[in-house]
A protein has these predicted regions:
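Charged, low-complexity intrinsically disordered regions
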Residues: 3-67, 71-186
């Protein structure tokens, strides 16, 4: 069983995926409009819970709302969506947050911007390296002052990781300066 199969095997509630697919598709279309990216031609549905196996256990802090999309290339294409809010709701809060305390919006209780920026960079780097270790290759990086999108792929799927910033959003130039270095590792 390869990485994509392991992801999908974690969610067996096909009916629930069907019921949520239209809402997720609308969300996704809106995000692509905001990010000025071309939508993938083959999108449908997949689960909600699966990126846990891809995430490195290293992060001690998550100060953003992280959302992951997995797009499968197949005759009946699927995509998988998971976010920190959903993870918290299904009972894996400690896995994502470490020892940090989060409010209802999954924002860490700190106002030290320098510290916050270092944590974001660290979380992104650990995620990136964990996914590369699972067989994903980088496509590109896209960012604004409020969000950053990391895109990776395998022969079977494409994965996008979105980090949504709120009150601690650093300038995009600084985000790009740190995160673009990740691609030099491969």
């Amino acid at each position: 069983m390869d990485f994509v199969d392991r992801l999908l095997s974690l969610d067996t509630d096909y009916r629930n995926r069907l019921e949520t697919s239209q809402w997720i598709a609308r969300e996704y279309a809106g995000r692509y409009t905001r990010y000025r990216m071309r939508p993938h031609a083959d999108l449908a549905i997949a689960g909600q819970r699966a990126l846990i196996s891809a995430w490195s256990h290293g992060p001690e802090h998550i100060i953003t709302e992280a959302t992951f999309w997995l797009f499968l290339r197949s005759p009946n294409p699927h995509y998988l969506h998971i976010s920190t809010r959903r993870i918290r709701q299904i009972g894996t809060r400690r896995f994502m947050t470490g020892n940090s305390e989060f409010d209802e919006n999954c924002l860490v209780h700190t106002r030290d911007e320098g510290h916050a920026r270092r944590l974001v960079n660290s979380d992104l780097q650990r995620t990136f390296l964990a996914l590369c270790g699972a067989g994903f290759k980088p496509d590109g990086l896209l960012g604004t002052s409020a969000a950053i999108t990391l895109s990776l792929h395998t022969d079977r799927a494409r994965l996008e990781c979105h980090w949504y910033r709120s009150d601690l959003a650093p300038p995009y130039a600084e985000f790009h300066r740190h995160t673009s270095r990740l691609f030099e590792l491969l």
